[in-house]
């Protein structure tokens, strides 16, 4: 997934994943598999063609054991946004070619408004959230994940409105709600209820919400 993203799965691990896919189907909870090829021994423009073949071979392995949704992660990584958008485009095309695979999900470098200057992703333009997401305007079916205005941000109408009307050209966010995860403070557990302080009632202008346990 991350540090070993170039390595294909052995048969025993594929069987474990097949069982997880089946457990998801049985519980009406879709299993999605993610790859992060931008951090450890990252894909580059010079290795792109060979690395794309490796990624697709791995996707084929997972498809053959029942995985029907895939996630491409670029969070907390360096590199230029054009390379990330290029890989999104090619993997989106692979997903579409299968006919029964759900839309590709993408976790961007700018996964929250606060992340806009955490890496030098720009291609010469000003580093703004809107300029970042312009690189994905030609990929309307790729689902863009978003944690809000900051890493651990509540699901609020304001951030969905910002994403749709200011940060993108009418796209709806697929929110990655960083709750009740506690990796920003290992000294305590998040034990409170998920009330309106975490998830506002009556939300609109969003594609979906997943929580991070």
Give each language-model segment a name.
Residues 1, 73, 144:
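Non-cysteine beta-strand/loop elements that form the S-adenosyl-L-methionine
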Residues 1-51, 55-58, 64-68, 96:
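Feature activates predominantly on carbohydrate-active enzymes
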Residues 7-8, 58, 68, 77-213:
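Catalytic-core regions of glycoside hydrolase
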Residues 32, 71-73, 210:
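Conserved beta-strand positions in the central sheet of alpha/beta enzyme cores
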Residues 35-37, 74-76, 179:
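Short, histidine-centered active-site or binding-site loop motifs used for metal coordination
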